[in-house]
A protein has these predicted regions:
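N-terminal glycine-rich phosphate-binding loop and ensuing alpha1 helix
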Residues: 3-6, 21-22, 54-118
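Short amphipathic alpha-helical interaction segments
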Residues: 23-35
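A short, conserved structural fragment
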Residues: 37-46
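Conserved alpha/beta core of the MobA/IspD/sugar-nucleotide pyrophosphorylase nucleotidyltransferase superfamily
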Residues: 47, 51-64, 214-300
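ATP-binding pocket architecture of kinase catalytic cores
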Residues: 313-418, 429, 435
């Protein structure tokens, strides 16, 4: 009530209007206002006094942390080209909209943690006056590693994801207690779900559920939560296996000590897009133009339009590439996207020439196209595919038959490869990238 009155200090409200605005009964508002007047926190005209503003001060939001380091691999293929937070939705970049909403709520101390494609995020510092922290471990650890970098900033702090879209501004300048935003998931969900008591305090967390409150969106750490959570974070992060977990996993193990409210929001207000198909349902522009070179590559190769490309599913990453499957015009395909920096140690032109020969000899029946300059490839999808089992003689025999057919074909390319020199060269390049 005090926070509402401060936010709307230029206006005068009746008790009935306050009850409607705050979704409280008229009787409850009457009792609260009587108490506030007795304490001299509001005056007879129901305006906040100087003492009332002082009482609010411990509940003022100090800062916000925006998590933007992850690769968002589920959001293929757009996340292969730009960080998910830089996607434009309804004409605004996700992270820019979030920063503006925080600043409109009076929160100026904002830190953005970057990692994957970090250089594309650096402009935010100059444009919005935010601080940038780089997480160089983004590719091997989970978001707990990001919080470790800013643990000393945790206080009365918003923890935000760069890829949420808030239809209405959910941020406030004063908050009574810490909370995790939740939306009601109709049917099955694989999100983390909050189990709460009658006061909406989260008392347990389960992964996945049905017709339940899913933990989606922003989080607010109050000062008491932050002090305890910092201890938990430092303790848990010492264990190497735990570094691959979400900070929510740490929280769930100490949920009885780390108190947060489950704050309920409408799914029409808090949006999280886990796939291009979901984004298309909210922003129809992506049906026509996804602003993606990858989508353009597919359209040109398969003679289709962007809306024909559906059911995109990330596949397990290879050693040097990232791939996803998709449906297009009644057939299923795989798009292979070259990993960053692989052009330094993989000769894509040589690979493309070999691929074309394998297709010509009917050794590879799936090959559709490969770009020898950029390294991307499109193939037909093979259901129930398996890797070669070197201990299975039937597998080895089939593989050797294919290799024999290739080497006895007489086909040649203009490329050559010395495997021993190649191994030495590969090792040196990995060392130079601190990946060996």
């Amino acid at each position: 009530l005090l926070s509402f009155m401060l936010t709307h200090k230029e206006k005068t409200f009746t008790q009935r209007q306050l009850a409607e605005e705050l979704d409280l009964s008229l009787g409850t508002v009457n009792i609260l206002l009587k108490k506030l007047k007795e304490e001299k926190w509001v005056d007879e005209e129901l305006h906040l006094t100087e003492l009332g503003q002082k009482i609010l001060e411990p509940y003022r939001v100090k800062n916000a942390i925006i998590m933007a380091a992850g690769m968002s691999s589920r959001f293929a293929p757009l996340s292969y080209e730009i960080p998910k937070g830089l996607l434009q939705v309804k004409g605004e970049r996700l992270i820019e909209r979030e920063i503006r909403q925080l600043q409109e709520a009076g929160i100026e101390d904002i830190t953005v943690i970057v990692g994957y494609l970090q250089e594309k995020m650096f402009y935010l510092a100059e444009k919005f006056g935010v601080k940038i922290v780089v997480n160089n471990d983004y590719y091997k650890y989970n978001n707990c590693s990001s919080l470790m970098l800013v643990k000393n900033q945790l206080s009365n702090t918003y923890i935000c994801s760069s890829d949420n879209y808030f239809v209405e501004n959910p941020f406030e300048q004063y908050i009574y207690r810490g909370y995790y935003s939740t939306i009601f998931a109709e049917g099955q969900t694989d999100e983390y779900c909050a189990i709460e008591d009658s006061n909406h305090t989260i008392i347990d967390i389960q992964i996945g559920g049905e017709n339940t409150w899913a933990m989606v969106g922003h989080v607010y750490f109050d000062r008491a939560f932050s002090e305890k959570f910092k201890e938990v974070l430092e303790t848990e992060f010492k264990h190497e296996p735990y570094r691959e977990q979400l900070w929510e996993d740490y929280y769930s193990r100490y949920v009885k000590e780390l108190l947060l409210e489950a704050r309920h929001y409408s799914a029409d207000i808090v949006k999280e897009f886990d796939s291009l198909d979901e984004l298309r349902q909210f922003d129809e522009r992506y049906l026509v133009n996804a602003d993606s070179a990858i989508i353009d590559n597919i359209c040109k190769t398969l003679k289709c339009v962007a809306s024909d490309i559906v059911n995109i599913k990330p596949l397990k990453d290879g050693l040097t590439n990232t791939s996803f499957s998709f449906d297009c015009l009644g057939k299923k395909y795989v798009y292979r996207h070259p990993g960053r920096g692989t052009e330094n140690y993989i000769d894509r032109a040589s690979e493309a020439a070999s691929m074309e020969i394998a297709a010509k000899l009917k050794i590879d029946h799936t090959f559709v196209a490969m770009n020898k300059d950029e390294g991307w490839k499109i193939s037909e999808f093979i259901p129930n595919a398996k890797q070669l089992d070197y201990d299975n003689w039937d597998d080895v025999t089939q593989a050797m038959d294919l290799l024999r057919r290739l080497h006895q074909s007489g086909e040649k390319t203009e490329h050559s490869f010395d495997q021993f020199e190649g191994i030495i060269d590969f090792r040196e390049k990995l060392k130079a990238r601190n990946r060996f």
